[in-house]
């Protein structure tokens, strides 16, 4: 059985109504509230066909129907109408741009997560940029006291790593320390973290020559940076948002969701953005705890280079068009803030 234009219009009306109200939808509701030009009996028959085709489900003994994951998939891919931002949403995003202008990258990322959870009323999870994907912009050794330096690594994506370097000998004078910084930067700047290999390290050792203690103090920092290149920090905002949806009044569903939200690494594995924004619905999520969820995920970028993932998680019954519009606008502004810092 193929899905014809009339069935599509009925399915679209059912999903729009269910997203708005959260109540199972009956044929009389569609006939009364949507000008489809057909009667309740015909709609009822078409709804039975849509259920047989897997686009609708009948919860419990309810006379109404709700969309299945298959129904939502067709809706997201073909049927939903585009929505615009409200004036309030637009103003809130503009304020976010102002607030983020002078912040460090990690704080911008955390603020982005808070904004998305606020505007979408969903749970937002975002990872900080992976150092592995970054290039070294500068390294500075700065005197703390007579026997301590702090090394400051800055990547092109704005990630900053600080480490204390303890020396047995006195910290070199300012002019000498300036030359040492120049040597280190000449060797390492514009390399990606992945490109710092044994050959690069040996050449740096030769370049530093007489400053062996500086090299020996710097070496473990380089190794630590390499070993932690894949590590990212994960921020989560709006954890309780999802429990405002009646779908999670069921204690077993609520427990499953809490189990998923408490495992950030497992949650990040569910974020598999392809091109632009990716929506995975219900059974499309391979983890059992996420089978009743929808996940909207995307990558954010630095100068068109993806550097991190971001995702929203909620029930299957969400306003997909609105959520996708908000996410698209916020990520566009995040990419611009990161790529064009003030």
Curated annotation (Swiss-Prot):
Keywords linked to the UniProt accession: Repressor, Stress response, Transcription, Transcription regulation
Lineage: Bacteria, Bacillati, Bacillota, Clostridia, Eubacteriales
UniProt keyword annotation of Repressor present: yes
Family: Belongs to the HrcA family.
Official protein name in the record: Heat-inducible transcription repressor HrcA
HAMAP family for this protein: HrcA
Gene3D superfamilies named among the record's database cross-references: 3.30.450.40, Heat-inducible transcription repressor hrca homolog, domain 3 (3.30.390.60), Winged helix-like DNA-binding domain superfamily/Winged helix DNA-binding domain (1.10.10.10)
Gene: hrcA
Role description: Negative regulator of class I heat shock genes (grpE-dnaK-dnaJ and groELS operons). Prevents heat-shock induction of these operons.
NCBIfam families: hrcA
Signal sequence segment: none
GO molecular function annotation: DNA binding
Pfam families in alphabetical order: HrcA (PF01628), HrcA_DNA-bdg (PF03444)
Stored InterPro entries: GAF-like_dom_sf, HrcA, HrcA_C, WH-like_DNA-bd_sf, WH_DNA-bd_sf, WHTH_HrcA_DNA-bd, WHTH_transcript_rep_HrcA_IDD
PANTHER family assigned: HEAT-INDUCIBLE TRANSCRIPTION REPRESSOR HRCA
GO biological process: one example: negative regulation of DNA-templated transcription
